Structure formats: C-alpha cells, structure tokens
Regions:
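General beta-strand structural signal in soluble alpha/beta enzymes
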Residues: 83, 114-118, 135-140, 146, ...
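Internal helix-turn-beta structural module
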Residues: 290, 294-315, 324-392
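Short beta-strand-loop/turn "lid" adjacent to the catalytic site in phosphate-handling enzymes
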Residues: 71-116, 137, 143-152
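Glycine-rich phosphate-binding loop of actin/hexokinase-like ATP-binding domains
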Residues: 144-245
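Adenine-nucleotide phosphate-binding core of ATP-dependent small-molecule kinases
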Residues: 257, 264-268, 275-310
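Glycine-rich beta-strand-to-loop/alpha-helix junction loops that act as flexible
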Residues: 8-9, 84-88, 200-202, 314, ...
C-alpha cells in the first residue's frame, strides 16, 4: 500500500510517500517557514538529491497544497494518507480514520497543543477536500500512553480543576515508543517483557512498556515535562514559574518561551541545542558543555530509575532518535549508572552502533539486553493507515 505520511509542525511540514510492504520511500520533502512571507520547499524522489525553491507558505493549507501539486507530477499513486497528530487528548487510545466526528475531537483538544493541532487539522481538511475518495488516518503521539494506570497519569491537583480543564499526564513520542516495542519484540521475542524505551533527541522522553502496554512515560500534560532536552528545561519546581513572574516581572508568554525555546542543552552549554556541537566543545574542555552533557545523562538516568520501578524491573533498554542513535558516549554514561542492575555494555559494539540499523550493544552476560534501534515514525504511521483501512 502506498501511503503519504504528513507530519505538520508549528511552522513546518514534512512528508514521505512510502510502500508499506517494501518500506521503499518513493518521495519525501519538507515545507519550512510556514506563516512567514517566504518559505522553502524541498522535494526528492527515489533517494535522489533534494531540489529546493522559495515558495510563499502563508498557512498549512498552502504548504500541503504545494506537496500534493508536486506529487501529482509523478507517476506515484497514493492509496491513503496518514497524519501525525501531536495531541489526541482524552478522546483517542488508538489511531483513527478521519471523519467529521474525529476532526471535531482533534479541534476540541487543540488548546492542549495549540501550536500543532490547528495546523495538522488544516492539512487534514485540505487532503479530504482534494482527494475525498482517499482514506485519511490520524495517528496520535498520545494514544499509546492512554494505557497508563490512573495512579501514573493523575496530577495531585483539585479534581474539579483537572476534570474541567482535562489536566493529566498525556505523554508524547508515542508513535516512536510503539515502534521501538514492535521492533524489539520482533528481534528478541519472549526475552522482551519489560522494556525501557529511550527516545533521546532534541525532544526527549522515556517510556516504560510492559508486554506492549505503556505503564508510564516522562512527558506530561505537554512535551515540556520530563527530561532535559535541546531547548526545553524538562521537570523543574512548578513554583519557578510563579517566582519568575512575581520577582522578575516576566509575562506568562515570556516564561513559556524561556522554558520551551531557551532552556535545556542550549541554556546550560551557552552555545547550542545540538548535542554534536556540545560534545565537540566538551571534548576540548569547555566546562559549560561538560556540564550540559553530564546533566543530560544524569536527568535521563534519574528518570529512567522511576520508569524501571514502575515495571518492577527491566529486561530490555532501547536507545533511539538523534542522540540515542548516534551518541555512544551518552549511551555509555547512561548504562554505567545501571551497573547495579546488571547492565553491561560492550564498549566496541556501542561505539560501532551508529547508523547501522538495529544492533545489540550489551555485553555477554549482561542481565539486561541493551539495543540501538533507529526509529521510523513514518513507517509506523503508514502501518496504521494500512491496518485501519485495508478491510474497508
């Protein structure tokens, strides 16, 4: 089945057309700077070089329109369209074929992710209008985490407030965590029972997965909670917000921007939110970059402990996403903290596990299997399109 996967961000849109049977990618590209006077459109086919051009993208409708216009010039067919949706809220515990009711629910929960859901909804609506005969499937970052028990997702705030405003832990990166479980189970079989999935990138989260069911995750009501990230602070004392507004005179929006866009690795290193830049400077002795590296690993280790406790142990640890897949030193620092659990990694395998597909990096005799599995959210979304539409 040929599926067009659409991933609409707050000011960008990425797409990929792939075959769910062979995983062959026919075309892919991106639209950047949506909402500005002039955007950038990039497109490539069959693994060829990306061609770019400047195109005005006043909104997400204009961006997806340009994508479909480009694909219509090719001989590729589209059998279905899958859309990544950041927030499914309390409505969705699985992906869903889009109809008017599903669209209404996506917009109803949009206040929980206003920078994403509205743009994603606009892209879906355009696709439905353009190709009414094609199925559109919404795949939610949050749905995988809806299996968390009440004790894990409930916040210790007044119940009437939580009920009125739907305040609870929702998590994120669910499509990636679900893919990691699927791949680990395929490779390890019955040896994979309690899995710690470590999605470590510019955005980062952990998930405790027991027999395919999410027991807990580190992101919360929004993707700001949990681990220290590229530009996000992660978990801090909530009173910090009140303190900064009271003593510093910061507005709500200024604090929101600070914690989401000016914090994390960028704030501590003082130079970049890119782990590669920080690693280079740290190796040269830059003290702020060394601290940023150590804090990132420490925060991940610290919260991994709570994820492991929620499963009463761990059999498998998976690293994925930009940092998890490519930074052997972060993996080593993380795993060394769990030697007391019997985690042992093979240093040579760990160093070599960069961009080479799924690989086991744990040493012989390790009580826990440790792997690097490159994530593939696009395939997972396409897989859901096929799963939900093939019998219709």
């Amino acid at each position: 089945m040929n599926v067009l996967v659409v991933n609409a961000g707050s000011s960008s849109l990425k797409y990929q057309l792939l075959d769910t049977d062979t995983r062959e990618v026919f075309a892919k590209g991106n639209c950047e700077r949506i909402g500005s006077d002039m955007g950038i459109f990039g497109h490539s086919e069959n693994g060829g070089a990306k061609q770019t051009e400047e195109v005005p993208f006043p909104d997400h409708r204009s961006a997806i329109a340009r994508v479909l216009e480009e694909l219509e010039k090719t001989d590729f067919t589209i059998d279905g369209i899958g859309h990544r949706i950041v927030q499914g809220g309390w409505h969705f515990d699985d992906s869903a074929v889009v109809d008017d009711e599903v669209m209404a629910k996506i917009l109803e929960v949009a206040p929980l992710a206003p920078l994403h859901n509205y743009g994603e909804a606009a892209a879906i609506e355009y696709c439905r209008e353009k190709y009414p005969e094609l199925p559109n499937v919404a795949v939610f970052d949050t749905s995988f985490h809806m299996t968390m028990p009440e004790v894990a997702y409930t916040y210790a705030l007044p119940k009437d407030v939580c009920d009125k405003y739907h305040v609870r832990k929702y998590g994120a990166h669910g499509t990636s965590h679900r893919y990691e479980w699927m791949m680990a189970k395929e490779i390890l079989g019955s040896r994979c029972h309690r899995l710690l999935s470590c999605h470590l990138g510019n955005g980062a989260s952990l998930a405790a997965i027991e027999d395919g069911v999410c027991r807990d995750t580190t992101m919360g009501l929004t993707p700001l909670d949990g681990l220290m990230m590229g530009t996000r602070c992660g978990s801090i004392d909530p009173a910090t917000v009140c303190y900064l507004q009271r003593e510093g005179g910061y507005s709500y929006q200024e604090v929101d921007d600070m914690m989401n866009k000016q914090s994390g690795l960028l704030a501590i290193s003082g130079i970049s939110n890119d782990a590669r830049d920080i690693r280079t400077r740290a190796s040269e002795g830059d003290e702020r970059c060394l601290l940023a590296f150590d804090m990132f690993a420490y925060k991940a280790m610290q919260q991994a402990g709570s994820m492991i406790a929620s499963m009463a142990g761990v059999d498998t640890i998976i690293f994925t996403a930009g940092i998890g897949e490519n930074d052997w030193s972060i993996r080593k620092a993380f795993c060394d903290c769990f030697e007391w659990l019997g985690v042992r990694i093979d240093n040579n395998k760990n160093r070599e596990a960069v961009g080479n597909g799924p690989q086991v990096i744990s040493a012989a005799g390790s009580a826990v299997t440790v792997m690097v599995i490159p994530t593939d959210e696009e395939y997972m979304i396409a897989h859901d399109v096929e799963r939900l539409t093939k019998n219709n």
